[in-house]
């Protein structure tokens, strides 16, 4: 019943638009933090055309499981980490065997939560606050 009530207030189109805005915001936030993607890399397309509200990242210098554990234990940010039951896809993407950290966004997420995640990623990866960062770190 709660799901139906939610959908009566918010159309599927509104939810999708919101989720894709968050996806673009998060990708742009990562690219603002690390334009050359040396410490934090977006895996896959850098735009929202033909994608869903999921963003996978890789931190080449830090173990993916360690980074995901720190996101959870230190910042309360839940992610999924690893090969996501798709090792062949990760081989194709060049992220095997480490995998990625996967963030997904839903209709209840906010830009403030994404700012918290971006700030946590900046701290974990050692990225420093610098010019070009637009999300207020």
Positions of PLM-derived features:
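Pyridoxal 5′-phosphate
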Residues: 1-137
């Amino acid at each position: 019943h709660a799901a139906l009530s939610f959908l009566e207030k918010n159309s599927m189109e509104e939810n999708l638009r919101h989720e894709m805005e968050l996806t673009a915001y998060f990708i742009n936030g990562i690219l603002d933090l690390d334009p050359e993607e040396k410490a934090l890399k977006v895996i896959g397309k850098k735009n929202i055309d033909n994608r869903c509200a999921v963003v996978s990242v890789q931190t080449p210098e830090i173990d993916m499981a360690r980074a995901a554990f720190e996101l959870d234990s230190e910042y309360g940010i839940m992610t999924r980490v690893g090969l996501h039951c798709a090792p062949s896809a990760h081989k194709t993407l060049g992220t095997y065997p480490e995998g990625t950290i996967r963030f997904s966004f839903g209709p209840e997420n906010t830009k403030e939560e994404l700012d918290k995640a971006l700030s946590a990623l900046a701290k974990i990866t050692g990225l420093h606050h610098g010019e070009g960062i637009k999300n207020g770190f």
